[in-house]
């Protein structure tokens, strides 16, 4: 029997044990990155489709894969004999993923996914849909990971710092800029999970995603403190020393899911609901005020300073 068919059947057994009607597997890491490392390629491992964009939906007795026109031929070949039906996005008569879910999940049913792989805005939409159906939305279960026995380790390539001569502003200056924007938004805390923003803010780079110089990490920024959640094996003593000089506390990558539970009632947290993952959001106490807004670093990063402009010219001449 086709190996991917076997994997999907194992997933369906896990779903059945939890009373799930459908399980959603997007192409995503825990940071909504466009490209993902080997550890996060659950959709590809389950379905056999290796393209960079696609969403797998598994029901109790079938499976469906949505992808765009770039991959119709590739997906058709790779999904052969897997039992997965190819759903050609934006083709006439083909529903979107959300339309399919809404139409096919029964009243009182259950939708599941790994909540770390969807954004807050997506999670809220699915939760609202299931509430209207008087059903359940389970977002704490990584069922693909549960059955993936030889799953690759999460990347932990060595991080390195970028000298201010290349970027024009120190991490201390950038942190001060972001804190001013936080204050303007009435927030005393900022939860940051987009990897490019973290790389820019802390003047740090990594190699955790192929061809993307980023490091898997989260940041919690308060009025006084900076907490950098990262796989500590990726941080050398020299890098740690430099970050600590800037008042940055280095903590283990997954600890952020516990620390957000400690936000206080009087805190106001600025976060981008299109980027921060839903599972992390669900850990924040409901009594804590949240402000949905674009990461302050996003427009700052887009406006190149004199040093950056000069270095861009140098790199292209």
Region locations from a protein language model:
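Terminal domain-start leader segments
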Residues: 1-317
């Amino acid at each position: 029997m086709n190996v991917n068919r076997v994997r999907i059947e194992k997933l369906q057994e896990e779903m059945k044990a939890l009373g799930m009607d459908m399980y959603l597997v997007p192409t995503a890491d825990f940071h909504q990155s466009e490209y993902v490392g080997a550890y996060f390629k659950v959709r590809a491992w389950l379905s056999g489709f290796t393209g960079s964009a696609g969403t797998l939906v598994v029901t109790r007795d079938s499976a469906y894969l949505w992808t765009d026109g770039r991959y119709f031929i590739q997906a058709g070949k790779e999904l052969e004999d897997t039992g997965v039906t190819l759903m050609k996005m934006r083709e006439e008569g083909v529903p979107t993923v959300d339309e399919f879910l809404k139409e096919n999940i029964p009243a009182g049913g259950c939708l599941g996914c790994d909540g770390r792989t969807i954004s807050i805005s997506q999670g809220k939409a699915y939760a609202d849909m299931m509430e209207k159906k008087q059903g359940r939305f389970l977002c704490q279960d990584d069922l693909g990971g549960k059955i993936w026995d030889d799953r690759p380790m999460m990347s932990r390539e060595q991080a390195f710092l970028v000298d201010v001569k290349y970027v024009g502003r120190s991490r201390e200056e950038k942190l001060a800029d972001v804190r001013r924007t936080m204050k303007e938004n009435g927030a005393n805390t900022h939860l940051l999970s987009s990897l490019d923003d973290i790389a820019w803010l802390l003047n740090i780079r990594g190699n955790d995603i192929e061809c993307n110089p980023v490091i898997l990490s989260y940041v919690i920024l308060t009025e006084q403190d900076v907490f950098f959640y990262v796989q500590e094996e990726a941080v050398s003593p020299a890098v740690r020393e430099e970050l600590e000089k800037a008042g940055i506390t280095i903590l283990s990558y997954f600890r952020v899911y516990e620390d957000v539970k400690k936000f206080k009632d009087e805190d106001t947290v600025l976060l981008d609901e299109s980027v921060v993952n839903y599972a992390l959001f669900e850990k924040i106490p409901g009594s804590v005020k949240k402000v949905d807004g674009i990461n302050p670093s996003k427009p700052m990063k887009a406006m190149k300073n004199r040093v950056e402009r000069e270095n861009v010219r140098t790199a292209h001449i």
